[in-house]
């Protein structure tokens, strides 16, 4: 369960209040969508939910976020610069201690991503936006997780992948 109490988030650059006095409890198994216009704090709220102790230079906040230290999946809007320079081989196999390979290959098949590419030396930076999202979904969902945080998951997504994601979220 995740519990948010009296959370107010302020953007420190322009002192704009992004979230005001939010109170929310998310029960185990519950699905929540954060919907709003661009630039109004959805990603900032999500970043704090993923890591309430994170120091975010552009934000200040008051209130409490309580959540267990259970494993989680976080797929940001854009893949980080540090991951862009990795090869697919390194991305999928350099840190494998908790990967479930059966799930990894099943997800690759379901998302129409050729699993033979896992071992390639292709740089992540050369992938299309949709392929970058697919590799994140494949790898992260093949790890143990109790929470899944997706930031703008439909960006760069083709119709087939969007349909897959909707079905995944429903079940």
Residues of each region from the PLM?
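Catalytic Walker B motif of ABC-type/P-loop ATPase nucleotide-binding domains
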Residues: 148-152, 165
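Helical segment within the ABC ATPase nucleotide-binding domain
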Residues: 162-171
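ABC ATPase nucleotide-binding domain signature region
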Residues: 31-37, 43-100
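A short, flexible loop at the N-terminus of ABC-type nucleotide-binding domains that lies
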Residues: 1-4, 8-22, 28-30, 57-60
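Walker B catalytic motif
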Residues: 152-153, 158
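Short loop/turn elements that form and flank the Walker-type P-loop nucleotide-binding site
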Residues: 28, 68-70, 143-145, 171
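Conserved phosphate-binding and hydrolysis motifs of nucleotide-dependent enzymes
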Residues: 29, 36-41, 130, 151-152
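ABC-family P-loop ATPase nucleotide-binding domains
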Residues: 10-12, 70-71, 76-135, 139, ...
